[in-house]
């Protein structure tokens, strides 16, 4: 530690001297949740609890403190105390402008400044008295300190919250390594500048640590065969955490981020902790399966502004529901048996912690559960159970003293004890001044008899003097713990200039003392209480008991989520429909479709269901059309992050790491008959990230929407997006450079592949293994034809360039995307077996597409290229059926061949045509029921089925819309009737707030966030 502990001011150390032995007696002691000791006693000696219970032995040297009427609890433990100050770090921090990894690294630090697992949070720690005072005022006596920035942020520490001194440190090497999904922005050249990149860097760093450990083991055993590995203090520290099974504490901003952390923890066998976010109630089952300890904030949303109907338009149903459910998050987690501790973190005003906690208790969160979440639970997981968390013999004397039940709104926290030292916070007056008093007072020869009426709160009384000539409001009223009572009045009503001050002592119903006029004349006074305070309604507002939300969580949460997850019937029979098989049978009129256990069983006439079937659905589709589910070969929906634009080659990043299964676009696209989508990385990179093929299973978590068994793919890009000026001077800046970047990457991948093979064969484990590189792993998969390339492309010269590169390196191009000059070189595309996924009739949206024509698709199809139409848009994906109709218009093509452009053809391009794309026996039961011909702009999608499960139904949608409308009105009325303070949010100045799982739409057309 670098001298971080400031010396204690000698003037503040008097309470460090005698006495060191205390006897606290007469209190109601709550030694742990669920236990109460009435009129109990605690002996504290040298900072430790010597005894606790009823009628304990009284040490002769103890200083006795009478706590009659008080409650004593274990001191609270803050599990997530953020250390903000990092200026004195001895390594570069933040983003480094246009510097390569080797240029920013020191000899032993990690190349990326956001990776600092070797950092100890106390290296640059400065504890501000205001910070500790704020926490002590809430009853906290201990804190788990965590670093605030970076990706691998460093090791935590445990401290006491008393006066800062070397003895305040409980454990300098705390129990957790803190991790955050931190990244820059598009204007920032440093890696990573996206969530995609942050996750990839986390994974690569863990693999680096594994390799580093293995490399040193081999080197130490066989130094004669190997060069000494470069020392890396970051990886050394990370390996220590891994070997000690320390916790890895991931900070999460929403509930799906918790599941993302769970995938990383599963991959690397981590002891997972989560810093929560308040949205956990949305995915409780999945979060429970993580078996993680969660540090939970009480950051309830402010009351939405719905005061006018115009303002209410800016508030989504998701926001309204979150406002109603969020205060029950802790209760619902407790009911699921998920272990958690509560934190003041994320609160702008720390004082609101207790208010929010009591609000949760008021709504149904158990008092014992609430108390456990700030005492025994954090103590258990932070490794402090032997010394803190309960009031027991031998434990550190960290405790909290209140003037009543902590969970009573009127109760005040009077003091905390930290290591056996008392920190007075505020005192509750022993006497109660409220009531009506007859007061006699005299100065000089004048004697007066008036009435004094004291009302208000016990600790904050107010009142008035009722004299014969006037009723005079008291200017101030005070009452202290030693029964000293004081008040003042303006003297002008009594023909006295200035303020007249009174003070005295209350004993039961009698009070007496003296006053002082502005002229220093002494006033003698005495008073007798003749009536208690009646708690007039004007003085004391009756509090309405708040009830827990009655809303049922939807999947996903929001307006169109499902209250019950969809189930798959055993048998589905669609009768009397016009069926577009998209297979050899073509279009069949007045036919039936039979589905069993999620698979197409038969297409034919007069099909039937056995009467013994337990679960079946029969649909009369007379006059309707049934098609395979539509497939979008180029989408950017359902992802939190699309482009890692900091480098030209980012093959290590994966869309599957950032899937957003709660994206409302999924539901909207289901309503257009879409069932499968190829979610691609953006187009800012010569070699971008790995794709994710999904099925639009609305309501399932991210893992649940992945298309099982779909071939792996990756996004490439050519042209303006890759080399344009927006790339911040990043190489390449010309179209020639793009080719060289791609060739250079594959040359490195070939060398990497060869090294992997030679090292595995060489010298029987006596050579240091090749470091696993996630970027090169993906490129090797391409070389091995295990990963398809999907390439953003427009111009014929660039398309031909990539064709030649693919031939040189022997990899497979799955599709050229956009490919608007593909009609010029269709034969070359067909020759290598690549597909073309294009737009129907888009052109002139930038100069690069100046030669685009609407006949492009049909012309390539005629040349033997497998062609599909895609959306590259969350909106256009809702009507790909009418995009297919344009193929018939510009073809000319048959209706069936045109519809192939959005069904079987994209399935072929993605390598999933054995499962989807046509209605044939054995394939997945992904189908759509249309009101009419699917190529007609007048036809409507009525039902969308995936794997024999209904995910969209037009009739159900109408019912949901009505229910949502009614629910919205009810929530708005609840907000308007709420006693909660009005929000200061100005809807019209800032626009509508987005929920945690809402993301902006991306399109490859310009490569920008639209």
Residues of each region from the PLM?
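C-terminal cap of metal-dependent C-N hydrolases
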Residues: 27, 396-429, 577, 921-964
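Polyanionic/metal-chelating signatures
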Residues: 127-281, 412, 418, 505, ...
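Edge beta-strand at a domain terminus
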Residues: 4, 407, 476, 507-558
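Histidine-rich, glycine-flanked metal-binding segment
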Residues: 6-9, 14-20, 29, 33-75, ...
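His/Asp/Glu-enriched, well-ordered alpha-helical/loop segment
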Residues: 18, 88-89, 96-110, 118, ...
């Amino acid at each position: 530690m670098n001298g971080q502990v400031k010396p204690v001011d000698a003037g503040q150390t008097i309470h460090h001297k005698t006495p060191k032995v205390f006897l606290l007696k007469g209190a109601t002691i709550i030694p742990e949740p669920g236990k109460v000791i009435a009129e109990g006693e605690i002996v504290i000696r040298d900072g430790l609890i010597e005894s606790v219970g009823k009628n304990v032995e009284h040490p002769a040297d103890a200083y006795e403190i009478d706590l009659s009427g008080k409650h004593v609890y274990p001191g609270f433990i803050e599990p997530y105390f953020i250390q903000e100050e990092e200026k004195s770090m001895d390594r570069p921090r933040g983003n480094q402008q246009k510097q390569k990894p080797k240029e920013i690294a020191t000899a032993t630090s990690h190349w990326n400044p956001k990776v600092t697992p070797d950092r100890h949070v106390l290296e640059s720690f400065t504890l501000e008295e205001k910070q500790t005072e704020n926490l002590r005022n809430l009853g906290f006596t201990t804190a788990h300190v965590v670093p605030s920035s970076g990706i691998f942020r460093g090791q935590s520490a445990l401290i006491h919250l008393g006066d800062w001194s070397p003895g305040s440190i409980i454990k300098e090497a705390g129990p957790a390594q803190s991790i955050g999904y931190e990244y820059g922005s598009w204007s920032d050249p440093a890696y990573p500048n996206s969530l995609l990149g942050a996750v990839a860097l986390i994974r690569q760093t863990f693999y680096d640590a594994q390799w580093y450990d293995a490399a040193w083991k081999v080197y130490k055993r066989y130094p004669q065969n190997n060069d000494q590995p470069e020392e890396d203090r970051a990886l050394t520290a990370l390996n220590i955490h891994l070997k000690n099974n320390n916790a890895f504490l991931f900070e999460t901003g929403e509930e799906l981020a918790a599941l993302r952390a769970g995938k990383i923890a599963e991959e690397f066998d981590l002891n997972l902790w989560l810093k929560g976010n308040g949205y956990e109630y949305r995915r409780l089952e999945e979060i429970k399966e993580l078996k993680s300890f969660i540090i939970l904030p009480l950051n309830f949303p402010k009351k939405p502004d719905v005061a006018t109907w115009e303002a209410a338009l800016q508030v989504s149903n998701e926001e309204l529901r979150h406002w109603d459910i969020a205060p029950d998050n802790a209760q619902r987690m407790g009911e699921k048996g998920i272990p958690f501790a509560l934190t003041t973190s994320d609160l702008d005003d720390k004082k609101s912690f207790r208010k929010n906690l009591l609000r949760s208790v008021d709504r149904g969160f158990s008092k014992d559960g609430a108390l456990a979440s700030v005492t025994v639970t954090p103590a258990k997981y932070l490794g402090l159970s032997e010394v803190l968390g309960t009031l027991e013999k031998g434990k550190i004397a960290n405790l909290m003293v209140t003037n009543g039940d902590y969970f009573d709104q009127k109760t005040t926290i009077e003091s905390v004890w930290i290591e056996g030292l008392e920190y007075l916070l505020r005192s509750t007056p022993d006497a109660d001044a409220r009531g009506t008093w007859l007061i006699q007072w005299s100065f000089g020869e004048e004697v007066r008899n008036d009435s004094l009426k004291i009302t208000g709160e016990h600790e904050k009384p107010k009142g008035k003097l009722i004299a014969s000539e006037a009723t005079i409001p008291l200017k101030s009223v005070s009452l202290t713990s030693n029964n000293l009572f004081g008040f003042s009045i303006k003297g002008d009503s009594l023909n006295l200039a200035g303020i007249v001050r009174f003070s005295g002592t209350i004993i039961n119903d009698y009070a007496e003392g003296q006053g002082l006029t502005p002229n220093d004349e002494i006033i003698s006074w005495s008073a007798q209480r003749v009536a208690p305070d009646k708690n007039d309604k004007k003085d004391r507002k009756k509090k309405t008991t708040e009830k827990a939300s009655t809303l049922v969580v939807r999947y996903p949460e929001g307006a169109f989520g499902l209250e019950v997850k969809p189930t798959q019937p055993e048998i589905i029979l669609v009768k009397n429909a016009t069926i577009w098989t998209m297979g050899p049978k073509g279009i069949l009129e007045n036919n039936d479709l039979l589905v069993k256990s999620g698979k197409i069983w038969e297409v034919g006439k007069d099909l039937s269901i056995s009467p013994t079937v337990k679960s079946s659905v029969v649909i009369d589709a007379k006059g309707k059309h049934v098609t395979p589910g539509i497939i979008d070969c180029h989408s950017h929906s359902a992802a939190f992050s699309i482009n890692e634009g900091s480098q030209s080659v980012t093959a290590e990043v994966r869309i599957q790491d950032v899937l957003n299964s709660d994206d409302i676009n999924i539901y909207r696209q289901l309503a257009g008959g879409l069932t499968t989508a190829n979610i691609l990385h953006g187009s800012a990179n010569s070699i971008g990230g790995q794709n994710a093929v999904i099925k639009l299973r609305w309501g399932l978590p991210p893992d649940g929407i992945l298309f099982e068994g779909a071939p792996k793919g990756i996004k490439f890009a050519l042209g303006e997006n890759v080399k344009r000026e927006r790339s911040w001077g990043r190489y390449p800046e010309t179209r020639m450079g793009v080719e060289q970047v791609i060739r250079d990457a594959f040359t490195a991948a070939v060398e990497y592949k060869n090294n992997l093979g030679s090292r595995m064969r060489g010298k029987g484990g006596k050579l240091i293994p090749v470091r696993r590189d996630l970027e090169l792993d993906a490129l090797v998969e391409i070389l091995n034809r295990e990963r398809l390339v999907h390439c953003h492309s427009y111009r014929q010269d660039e398309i031909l360039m990539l064709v030649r590169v693919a031939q040189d390196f022997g990899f497979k191009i799955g599709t050229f995307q956009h490919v608007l000059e593909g009609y010029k070189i269709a034969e070359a595309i067909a020759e290598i077996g690549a597909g073309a996924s294009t737009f129907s009739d888009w052109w002139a949206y930038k100069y690069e597409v100046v030669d685009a024509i609407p006949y492009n698709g049909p012309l390539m199809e005629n040349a033997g290229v497998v062609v599909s139409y895609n959306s590259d848009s969350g909106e256009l994906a809702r009507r790909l059926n009418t995009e297919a109709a344009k193929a018939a218009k510009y073809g000319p093509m048959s209706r069936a061949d045109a519809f192939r452009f959005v069904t079987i053809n994209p399935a072929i391009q993605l390598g999933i045509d054995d499962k989807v794309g046509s209605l044939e026996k054995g394939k997945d039961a992904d189908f759509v029921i249309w009101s009419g011909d699917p190529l007609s702009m007048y036809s409507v999608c009525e039902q969308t089925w995936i794997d024999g499960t209904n995910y969209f139904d037009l009739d159900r949608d109408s019912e949901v819309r009505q229910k949502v409308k009614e629910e919205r009105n009810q929530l708005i009325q609840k907000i308007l009737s709420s006693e909660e303070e009005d929000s200061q949010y100005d809807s019209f100045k800032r626009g509508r707030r987005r929920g945690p799982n809402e993301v902006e739409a991306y399109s490859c057309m310009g490569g920008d966030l639209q």
